[in-house]
């Protein structure tokens, strides 16, 4: 380790294991999620004397005393954590051959950019990014990463199904450190990605079904005889869809793209607006003395079939992509 052997210019190899105990509190609006787990880091420094030549266990506040006496323990931090993570119990195991095993429990709220284009049929990744706070990749390198997710594999947490975890070790350059540490501004980083699939059941019953009923009600204008009743019904339901859009906007952050639910709402706007144009056109032809009941009769079938086809395409695309 750098503190144990300053003459050794080689970086210290640190292997890391992360055990995910629980993922919960997924906040779609703020794009955050809470992770409860354990981190185990292992590296090798100089051989040391231990009582009885057996591993020595040091816990919690005693660790600071060993660090103050010269024991090298790198500060590892999750860089995508929101605020300060709660680190519970900590433990060091010191071996006579120089090996050090650091074990700590952590609980924190993490953030990651999420893609909601297929919402509520979307898939997301819960990401953990770990870096050394002070040591660049010429001093410390992550050599291995193992992730254990047995407690959450194929389980439903909140509205998510956990699928699998993948890991990646990379070097990250921080250009703002170039003036302070020339050629020493690259840091080793561990990235853990946990794949999750949203369970859309809640949104199907609470959002998509009511929207479908509102739009289906708008087709009743093709069975009404009075022109004024047709217009009044259409405009009332158009305002209902507008209010529905405001309601659904509170479940997601402001996005520069449309989601599946947005596209369904847009299809609803289009359906009601097209119905308004058609009943006005039919009324105009009737005022001109041209009776055209066939147009209205065709709309009774064309509108439900057209919207059903659009809805099926959106749902199937969201499920299969």
Swiss-Prot record:
State the membrane topology. Multi-pass membrane protein
TM region(s), chain numbering: 204-224, 233-253, 264-284, 301-321
The keyword Transcription regulation belongs to this UniProt entry's keyword annotation: no
Name the chain's protein. Answer: Cys-loop ligand-gated ion channel
Stated family? Belongs to the ligand-gated ion channel (TC 1.A.9) family.
* Localisation per UniProt entry: Cell inner membrane
Could you tell me which Gene3D superfamilies the record lists for this protein?
A: Neurotransmitter-gated ion-channel ligand-binding domain, Neurotransmitter-gated ion-channel transmembrane domain
What is known about what this protein does?
Answer: Mediates cation-selective currents but does not discriminate between different monovalent cations.
Sorted UniProt keywords: Cell inner membrane, Cell membrane, Ion channel, Ion transport, Ligand-gated ion channel, Membrane, Receptor, Transmembrane, Transmembrane helix, Transport
Q: How does it assemble?
A: Homopentamer.
Ranges of the Periplasmic topological domain: 1-203, 254-263
The molecular function terms of the Gene Ontology recorded here are: extracellular ligand-gated monoatomic ion channel activity; identical protein binding; transmembrane signaling receptor activity
Q: Which SUPFAM superfamilies match?
A: Neurotransmitter-gated ion-channel transmembrane pore, Nicotinic receptor ligand binding domain-like
Motif Cys-loop is found at 115-123
Query: What spans does the record annotate as topological domain Cytoplasmic, numbered to this chain?
Result: 225-232, 285-300
